[in-house]
């Protein structure tokens, strides 16, 4: 059963305070980044992890469902794939405040209690490793809560993730190498990054080495990106340890 995780519209009216806030103070509730459907929840708000875990278990518990598949299990893109910059008339050579999440009151207070620093007062937030890790860990805790609940129901769990996972940490605050899922589907859309098919192999290799046998890696390939060198792309994925490919 496939369902978006952090990107949820159904709570706009009931829990407007649950939505992530960027460094400019704008909430995904009423001013989402990039596109109207980017309505991301803050992973640190009390009740968010519990709500999501219960929502997935409700589906996993159905007898005809073998497992759940997470998607949008991350923050909004602080850095978009480079080929998409032109679509929005932007150049993300640095982390721009309107795409940098989350700076809501809950996140600020939790980080300040932990480090003594207000993230809004950091001179270089993109270089502050404590602040980076704080947000990586917040998403991981949500995933852990969902995973624990789903596995208690003896169902499988997988996720669509950004490639890397080094790129995932940098681009969307997604540290999926620390998760404990059964399978990962990194979205290795090579032309999004102006890369050739050999990049697919490098990305798969990093992913396989990261999970180190704990989970399967299925390379998510964009057919339009590989149609002219389809066999080479598949060889790159399989020769570097992918258990399969998806498109």
Language model features with spans:
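Active-site beta-loop-alpha junctions enriched in small/polar residues
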Residues: 3-7, 70-75, 162-164, 189-191, ...
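Structural motif
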Residues: 62-63, 179, 240
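Conserved, mostly hydrophobic/aromatic
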Residues: 52, 59, 68-71, 150, ...
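Aromatic-rich peripheral "rim/lid" segments of glycoside hydrolase catalytic domains that contact
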Residues: 228-247
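Aromatic- and acidic-residue-enriched segments that line the glycan-binding/catalytic groove
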Residues: 6-34, 72-121
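Hydrophobic faces of well-ordered beta-strands that scaffold small-molecule active sites
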Residues: 1-2, 66-71, 157-159, 184-186, ...
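Active-site-adjacent "subsite" loops/lids of carbohydrate-active enzymes
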Residues: 1-63
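Glycoside hydrolase catalytic-domain groove-lining segments
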Residues: 97-233
